Amino acid sequence: PPGSWDLPELPEIGGPLEGEGAVADAQARLASLLGVDGCWFGVNGATGLLQAALSALAGPGQAVLLPRNAHRSLIAACVLGGIRPVFLPVPFLSDRGHPGAMSAQCLERALTALPSIPEVIVGAVLVHPTYHGYGSDPTPLIAALHRRGLPVLVDEAHGTHFAFAAGEALPTSSLHAGADLVVHSLHKSAPGLGQTAVLWLQGMRVSAEAVKASLLRFQTSSPSALLLASCEATLNWMLSPAWERLLQRRLKEAHQLADRLRAAGLPLSRSDDPLRLILVTAERGISGLDADAWFMQRGLIAELPEPFCLTFCLGLASQRGLAARMQRLWRRLQMSQPSSGPLEPLLLPPLETSSTPELLPALAVRAPACELSLQDSGGRIAAEMICPYPPGIPLLIPGERIGLDRLEWLLDQHRRWPELVPGKVKVLAEGPQVQLG
């Protein structure tokens, strides 16, 4: 039976928050090997560790800087902890229809636009890399936030392999760039079992005791020994010469694959992570959602379908034969579609400046609410998230007012992917309305 695969939380095994046992020994050893001050395994994915880490940074009534492409788990942490998010704009790649990576220049502009760093803002979050593999050097971003006295949490769920790569084959990991807290998924961008993740702590800006107290609130009291063993085994392997040899081989193959596909005319966009392939289907008049459904029926599985793109995650398995298969299926897909030009451009998100919800998200989700059609929601305050998943980046946050420009943009998003961006939204029960012109 499945129970035979697992073990109870025996003293000899312990758990992520125990002072003794095999898990505590493994965490201490790995922290030492990576030169950091703390290591905690997680069995509720990067989601649970991000929420615990954010809760260690900020408490009720305090605020944190969040990039607009923050994962929905961080918004949920704000709701659970009574934290106010202060959103920083990120570049929008209009030809691909999704956010890019925040650059040092973009961050400096956003920070300069804030009148000052109020005392209520007690920390900052960065995303490195994005789901699509975009990731500029995080060192100057982290340094800019540290200069303003802010500890930095980095969501590096999609860049775990960055921290375990030699040389300059991949972007710099935020763990090596001085971030105070870093969350790595061990199944998204590493070969661990689903739900496994790890949280790293370094420096003196965040206390280990605050992290432990937060983990105690957010993590299960009965962690699976199977998943904990996967955390240790995955990290052990990623510190071995065998991992480095495999990673370098797969990176070389990924570069060759991308070059071959581009030479064959496939509209591939550039990513900072060679293990991500971004097929810009919109250039040929095809929605990424339609392309994904068509490919899936023929056994070609992508990672992330969007209105303008289809992103593939190459992973660590051999991709022998993939280039020829993708070329063949791409030709067949184009032949199956009526000839047309590029898709109509997306409306740009009206999120170019720093902002904070008018109402604390924790209050907005608990306030009396009613459901309206999206068309009729102008001027109202949102009582829920609108968040297509994947990628899990909210388009609307509880507590934000739905102004005219935001409403027009949300309606455009609904038209582009109606199954993931609903045509209805919960709003606070009373409030002024704005009519579309």
Label the model's feature ranges:
Residues 38-64, 76-77:
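Conserved beta-loop-alpha segment that forms the PLP phosphate-binding cup at the N-terminus of a helix
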Residues 259-405, 409-418:
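Conserved C-terminal alpha-helix-loop-beta "cap" of PLP-dependent enzymes
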Residues 3-48:
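Conserved N-terminal alpha-helix of the aminotransferase class I/II PLP-enzyme fold
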Residues 170-213, 219-230:
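Active-site PLP attachment segment
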Residues 210-277, 306-309:
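Structural motif of enzymes handling amino- and sulfur-group chemistry
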Residues 96-161:
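Active-site phosphate-binding strand-loop segment of PLP-dependent enzymes
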Residues 66-85:
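Substrate-binding/gating loop at the entrance of the active-site cleft, primarily
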